[in-house]
């Protein structure tokens, strides 16, 4: 029975994944040429004029990853050419480097398909490890439903392009899996670390750090270590806290300081001025990270800056994920409280606050994929209360409409970005 259940999961996940991707690429192929000519001008500069396929996969920010990758390969530099390009994962641009532009696109799209597929199975394993086996079939069904929902991501068209979301959420989820495998809770809610799995716990920090290098919101994953540290402090396990969460958190924080402060300062300053001049006590570290500075200056990111009448459509685009994330937080805080869920809830609360009050709110549809809390809420609701959870049903219906719609809009270079 168990083997049959696992085989069914394998079959359903594979069929769903490849069916969704075929549908998306079919929509891209059928989409009309984009009204925006900036991508075509960029491609023509590199001698690609005959195939409109490339232009359809390179909408919105995709072009920045390509341009930086080409710049690094041709110039020999390990940093972007212009200040605003630092906001688009230089690490991902290095990874997708190739001999020419067409090969870069092919490499990036292939990597993203592979990463999305692999991360689907990571979600499957993480779900089975996180939730107690009340019954093998129930646990497997929860993992299967979560994995299918992960395939049906609201990121849609962004996941078949050159964006860095897939590599970010793959390593985010892998880090969660490593951490979850290393810990356990007793009936009193006390955290216990398996000393034989110390390397696994430490590996989670490297995964989170690499995810952060590709998507800055993954810095919030450091809250896992804050949670673990506080729990161990309560038990007065000082040595364990030092060698587990404190060491792991220090690695993540060190990567943050180096790549968002010191490295860009060394590359841009003192010639840049402005950002370079706001140093902390004369150290080569400005008060504000370069990423925050770029977001504020070039994309008008800041508290309530996005709360303007012309951005109402963008709030509507992001509303389904805002509502489902809020419901997931409430569900796991009160209706299904679990020690395992506590750090996920912390991360989701801060993430939701940032998305609604500080960021360009519509990007929640693609960047929320780094955290599986909402997927677990939907899956658990569909299994336990299939006839009562109206909001969950509406969200799933919205996904089924949104994925093909957004993919087609993306291929035509139309909002939302």
From Swiss-Prot:
<dbReference type="InterPro" id="IPR007315">
    <property type="entry name" value="PIG-V/Gpi18"/>
</dbReference>
<keyword id="KW-0328">Glycosyltransferase</keyword>
<dbReference type="GO" id="GO:0006506">
    <property type="term" value="P:GPI anchor biosynthetic process"/>
</dbReference>
<dbReference type="GO" id="GO:0031501">
    <property type="term" value="C:mannosyltransferase complex"/>
</dbReference>
<feature type="transmembrane region" description="Helical">
    <location>
        <begin position="10"/>
        <end position="30"/>
    </location>
</feature>
<feature type="transmembrane region" description="Helical">
    <location>
        <begin position="142"/>
        <end position="162"/>
    </location>
</feature>
<keyword id="KW-0472">Membrane</keyword>
<feature type="transmembrane region" description="Helical">
    <location>
        <begin position="167"/>
        <end position="187"/>
    </location>
</feature>
<feature type="transmembrane region" description="Helical">
    <location>
        <begin position="394"/>
        <end position="414"/>
    </location>
</feature>
<keyword id="KW-1133">Transmembrane helix</keyword>
<feature type="transmembrane region" description="Helical">
    <location>
        <begin position="104"/>
        <end position="124"/>
    </location>
</feature>
<feature type="transmembrane region" description="Helical">
    <location>
        <begin position="239"/>
        <end position="259"/>
    </location>
</feature>
<keyword id="KW-0256">Endoplasmic reticulum</keyword>
<feature type="transmembrane region" description="Helical">
    <location>
        <begin position="344"/>
        <end position="364"/>
    </location>
</feature>
<keyword id="KW-0812">Transmembrane</keyword>
<comment type="function">
    <text>Mannosyltransferase involved in glycosylphosphatidylinositol-anchor biosynthesis. Transfers the second mannose to the glycosylphosphatidylinositol during GPI precursor assembly.</text>
</comment>
<comment type="pathway">
    <text>Glycolipid biosynthesis; glycosylphosphatidylinositol-anchor biosynthesis.</text>
</comment>
<keyword id="KW-0337">GPI-anchor biosynthesis</keyword>
<dbReference type="GO" id="GO:0005789">
    <property type="term" value="C:endoplasmic reticulum membrane"/>
</dbReference>
<feature type="transmembrane region" description="Helical">
    <location>
        <begin position="312"/>
        <end position="332"/>
    </location>
</feature>
<dbReference type="GO" id="GO:0000009">
    <property type="term" value="F:alpha-1,6-mannosyltransferase activity"/>
</dbReference>
<protein>
    <recommendedName>
        <fullName>GPI mannosyltransferase 2</fullName>
        <ecNumber>2.4.1.-</ecNumber>
    </recommendedName>
</protein>
<feature type="transmembrane region" description="Helical">
    <location>
        <begin position="206"/>
        <end position="226"/>
    </location>
</feature>
<comment type="similarity">
    <text>Belongs to the PIGV family.</text>
</comment>
<dbReference type="GO" id="GO:0004376">
    <property type="term" value="F:glycolipid mannosyltransferase activity"/>
</dbReference>
<keyword id="KW-0808">Transferase</keyword>
<dbReference type="Pfam" id="PF04188">
    <property type="entry name" value="Mannosyl_trans2"/>
</dbReference>
């Amino acid at each position: 029975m168990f083997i049959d259940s696992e085989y069914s999961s394998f079959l359903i996940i594979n069929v769903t994944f490849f069916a969704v991707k075929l549908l998306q690429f079919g929509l891209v192929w059928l989409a009309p040429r984009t009204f925006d000519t900036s991508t075509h001008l960029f491609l023509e500069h590199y001698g690609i004029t005959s195939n409109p396929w490339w232009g359809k996969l390179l909408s919105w920010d995709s072009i920045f990853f390509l341009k930086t990758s080409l710049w690094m390969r041709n110039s020999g530099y390990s940093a972007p050419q212009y200040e605003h390009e630092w906001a688009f994962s230089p690490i991902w641009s290095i990874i997708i480097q190739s001999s020419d532009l067409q090969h870069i696109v092919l490499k990036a799209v292939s990597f993203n398909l592979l990463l999305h597929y692999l991360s689907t199975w990571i979600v499957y394993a993480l779900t089975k490890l996180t939730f107690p086996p009340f019954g093998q079939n129930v646990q497997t069904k929860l993992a299967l439903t979560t994995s299918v929902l992960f395939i049906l991501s609201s990121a849609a068209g962004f996941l078949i392009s050159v964006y860095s979301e897939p590599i970010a959420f793959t390593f985010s989820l892998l880090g969660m899996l490593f951490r979850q495998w290393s810990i356990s809770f007793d009936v009193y809610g006390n955290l216990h670390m398996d000393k034989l799995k110390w390397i696994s716990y430490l590996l989670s920090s490297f995964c989170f750090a690499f995810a952060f290098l590709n998507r800055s919101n993954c810095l919030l994953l450091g809250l896992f270590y804050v949670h673990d540290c506080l729990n161990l402090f309560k038990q007065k396990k000082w040595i364990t806290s030092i060698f587990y969460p404190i060491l792991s958190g220090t690695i993540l924080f060190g990567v943050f300081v180096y790549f968002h402060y010191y490295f860009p300062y060394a590359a841009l300053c003192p010639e840049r001025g402005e950002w370079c001049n706001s140093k902390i006590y004369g150290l080569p570290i400005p008060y504000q990270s370069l990423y925050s500075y770029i977001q504020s200056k070039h994309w008008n990111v800041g508290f309530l800056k996005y709360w303007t009448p012309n951005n109402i459509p963008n709030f509507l685009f992001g509303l389904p994920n805002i509502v489902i994330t809020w419901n997931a937080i409430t569900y796991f805080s009160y209706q299904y409280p679990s020690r395992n869920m506590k750090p996920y809830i912390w991360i989701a609360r801060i993430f939701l606050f940032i998305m609604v009050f500080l960021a360009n709110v519509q990007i929640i549809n693609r960047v929320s994929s780094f955290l599986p809390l909402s997927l677990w809420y939907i899956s658990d609701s569909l299994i336990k209360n299939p006839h009562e959870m109206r909001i969950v049903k509406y969200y799933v219906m919205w996904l089924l409409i949104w994925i093909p719609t957004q993919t087609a809009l993306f291929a035509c270079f139309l909002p939302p970005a």
